C-alpha cells in the first residue's frame, strides 16, 4: 500500500465522518424529476407513489417532472439481459408483498407491441398535472398486468389525438436508465429503495405540506420484527444459516457483517459463514453512502485505511489459514482494525496483533492457494446471479433465500416473520383437520 494512503486515509476519513452529514439545503430550482422506463418493473412500483408524493409537495416543487426513456442501461455485474430481467421481476414481487404495491401474481415482461402502444398513449394525451399522473399509473398497470385489451382501447383513441405542445411536466428521452430514480438537488435517489431517504430530505428542508406515509412496512435498521420470547425461541430452534459473500476491501462488508453479527445473529441464533471474494476494486467507494450506513446502523466507522489488492490478499491468507471456528472472529477483527482504527494490514507492525492473537507464526498458504480459494468462492457467488454485493444466502426450515446488498438486509427479519406465519397457519390447519376427524 502507498504511504500516501496509509498516512492520509485515517486523517481524511475522520474529518469526513465528523463533518455535518447533510448539506443544510439542496437547491430546489429544478424541482424533482422522476426517470422511468415503460419496460422497467421498478418504474411500475414507483408510479404508484407519485400521486401521493405530488399531493404533499409544496407548490415550489410542483409539478413533478416525468422523463420516460426508451433506452435501458447495461445490466449490472455482467449479468445477461434475461437473468437481470428475471431478477428484477422476482425482487419487485418481494417489494410489492412487503410494501403492498399492486403487482401481478405471475409477473412477466410486457410485450414490445404493448410498450409501443403505451408510448403513443402518453405521448398524445392532453392530460396535465394530477390527471396525467393518474393516467401514467393506469397505463403502467395495464402494461404490467397484461391488460392488453384496455390498452388497445386507449391506443385506438390516442391515435386520433394531435401531438400536444411540449410540456414541462413530461417528456420522452433516449438516455440509458437502469432502474427508476428521482433526481433532486443534483442527487439521485433510487425510486423504491431511496424513497424514504428522499422524503426525509424534503421534510428536513420543509418542502412537504404534511408528513409522508410511504412504504408502511419498511423495517428500519436496529428495529426487530420479532420480540415475543416464544417466537424468538422458535426461530432460534430452527438454527438459521446465513452465507455472506463479501469483498474484503469494501467498507459495506465491515458495516453489514458487524451489524448482522451484533444485531441479528446473536438474537436469532444465526450461524454465519463468510466467503471472501477476490479483489473487486471496491476500495473506491461512495464515502457518503458508507457514512450514512454507519450512522443508521450505529456501527463504528473511521478512521479507516482503505485496503488495496495486496492488503486484501493478506487478509485472505490469515482467514484461510485458520479453522472455520476462528475464521469469522479473525475476519471481524481485521475489518475492525482496517475500518475503525486506520490500520494498514499489509504493514507488518499493524498485522502483528492479529497474528499473535490467533497464534499464527507464518502465513503458510501460497498466493496461488489463496487465489484458488477466492476464485472458488467467486464461482459460487456468480452462480447465485445477484447484481450487487454482499450476496446473502439464508437457509431456514428447509427453504433457501438469496438476496444482496445493504438494501435487502431487512429481508432476514421479514423471512423469519413469514416463516412463523406459515408455521402457525399450518398448525391451525392441522388442528382443524384433527377436529373434523
Which residue stretches match the model-derived regions?
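Aromatic-acidic/polar surface patches that form glycan- and anion
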Residues: 39, 188, 308
Amino acid at each position: 500500500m502507498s504511504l500516501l494512503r496509509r498516512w492520509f486515509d485515517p486523517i481524511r476519513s475522520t474529518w469526513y465522518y465528523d463533518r455535518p452529514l447533510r448539506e443544510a439545503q439542496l437547491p430546489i430550482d429544478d424541482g424533482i424529476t422522476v426517470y422511468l422506463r415503460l419496460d422497467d418493473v421498478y418504474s411500475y412500483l414507483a408510479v404508484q407513489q407519485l400521486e401521493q408524493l405530488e399531493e404533499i409537495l409544496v407548490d415550489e416543487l410542483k409539478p413533478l417532472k416525468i422523463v420516460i426513456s426508451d433506452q435501458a442501461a447495461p445490466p449490472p455485474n455482467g449479468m445477461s439481459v434475461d437473468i437481470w430481467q428475471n431478477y428484477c421481476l422476482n425482487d419487485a414481487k418481494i417489494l410489492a408483498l412487503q410494501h403492498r404495491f399492486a403487482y401481478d401474481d405471475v409477473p412477466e415482461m410486457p410485450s414490445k407491441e404493448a410498450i409501443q402502444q403505451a408510448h403513443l398513449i402518453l405521448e398524445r394525451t392532453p392530460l396535465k398535472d394530477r390527471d396525467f399522473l393518474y393516467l401514467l399509473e393506469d397505463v403502467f398497470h395495464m402494461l404490467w398486468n397484461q391488460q392488453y385489451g384496455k390498452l388497445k382501447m386507449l391506443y385506438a383513441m390516442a391515435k386520433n389525438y394531435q401531438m400536444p405542445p411540449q410540456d414541462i411536466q413530461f417528456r420522452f428521452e433516449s438516455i440509458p436508465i437502469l432502474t427508476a430514480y428521482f433526481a433532486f438537488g443534483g442527487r439521485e435517489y433510487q425510486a423504491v429503495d431511496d424513497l424514504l431517504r428522499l422524503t426525509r430530505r424534503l421534510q428536513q428542508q420543509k418542502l412537504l405540506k404534511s408528513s409522508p406515509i410511504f412504504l408502511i412496512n419498511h423495517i428500519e435498521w436496529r428495529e426487530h420484527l420479532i420480540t415475543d420470547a416464544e417466537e424468538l425461541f422458535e426461530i432460534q430452534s430452527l438454527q438459521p444459516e446465513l452465507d455472506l459473500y463479501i469483498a474484503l476491501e469494501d467498507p459495506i462488508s465491515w458495516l453489514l457483517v458487524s451489524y448482522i453479527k451484533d444485531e441479528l445473529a446473536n438474537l436469532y441464533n444465526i450461524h454465519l459463514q463468510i466467503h471472501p471474494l477476490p479483489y473487486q476494486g471496491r476500495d473506491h467507494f461512495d464515502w457518503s453512502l458508507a457514512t450514512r450506513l454507519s450512522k443508521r446502523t450505529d456501527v463504528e466507522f473511521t478512521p479507516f485505511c482503505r485496503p488495496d489488492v495486496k492488503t486484501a490478499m493478506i487478509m485472505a491468507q490469515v482467514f484461510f489459514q485458520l479453522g472455520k471456528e476462528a475464521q469469522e472472529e479473525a475476519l471481524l477483527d481485521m475489518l475492525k482494525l482496517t475500518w475503525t482504527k486506520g490500520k494498514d494490514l499489509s504493514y507488518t507492525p499493524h498485522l502483528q496483533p492479529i497474528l499473535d492473537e490467533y497464534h499464527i507464526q507464518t502465513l503458510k498458504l501460497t498466493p496461488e492457494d489463496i487465489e484458488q480459494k477466492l476464485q472458488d468462492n467467486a464461482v459460487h457467488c456468480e452462480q447465485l446471479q445477484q447484481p450487487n454485493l454482499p450476496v446473502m444466502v439464508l437457509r431456514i426450515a428447509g427453504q433457501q433465500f438469496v438476496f444482496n446488498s445493504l438494501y435487502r438486509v431487512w429481508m432476514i427479519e421479514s423471512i423469519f416473520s413469514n416463516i412463523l406465519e406459515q408455521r402457525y397457519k399450518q398448525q391451525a390447519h392441522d388442528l382443524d383437520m384433527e377436529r373434523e376427524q
